[in-house]
Amino acid sequence: MVTRVGDVFLLLGLVILFNTFGTLRYSELFNHPDLFNPENAESVKWATLCIFGGAVGKSAQFPLHFWLPDAMEGPTTVSALIHDATMVKAGVFLVARTYPLIVLSPDTAVYIAVTGAVTAFVAASMAMVMNDIKRVLAYSTISQLGYMFLALGTGAWAAWHAADHGLEVHAQGYMAGLFHLMNHAFFKALLFLGAGAVIHSVHTQDMREMGGLRKSMPITSTAMGMGVLSIAGFPLMSGFWSKDEILESVHKNGEYDGTFGALWWLALLTAAMTAFYMTRLWMMTFSGPETRVVEKMVKSKDHSETVSYTHLTLPTTPYV
């Protein structure tokens, strides 16, 4: 039912576009002779806002964010593939695909950026207090999706004001958002696969019943440690480069608009919160003495299938 709200907004946006320009083909919309007509500015604004409303429902952005943690009930392998690499990214891709329309509406760009930043912060605050390992990763996914929307909104606003403020690097936000989308697909899939290995071994998702698994599952603990470093933005890891680009693009906009200055501080705080709750996840799962549940249930074999994803979170110099 929650995603149906987004579906309604998406449908309204498509209706407005078709009623205004008579087509829904990207190639025809982006080259339509009336696209820059001032009389159509209001229609473009409402159409892009409604399309973003569809993305909010699909990519679990505030206030339609609460469905995603409940949708993580399937196997972690499914969550790694669908919920982190493909399905929930559809909203982000939709906004990126309709970018030539969004840059024509600075109001929509600001709304996208604010929604993304607020979502990133709210979801991170929830992840900090969760004890279910899969729910921590689920709220982390929502938070990182918010980062992507923040970057896309920032880039669109910069593109509109490029002539006024000389923002020649207005594409930085757009590229940073898509770069983070690709990075997140890999390191979050790694984290979910590692979490699945842990759950399969101890038969519980409650991190309070875990602990000390580093000794009995050294490969899984190392692989998840690499994923934690990447999502936390540790220097030279893939997540560091994309998060740095996002923060830089928001900071540059903040020099000309106070709203983006506030969003930069919020995004920076969220980055610190991300490092905290992901470190908390690893420490509660792998460090300290073994709990009774671990001593009783863990098997003396490691799950090496997560290793194949580890190298994807290592330094990605060729992409920079």
How would you label these PLM feature ranges?
Residues 1-312, 318:
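...captures the hydrophobic TM-helix bundle architecture rather than a specific catalytic motif
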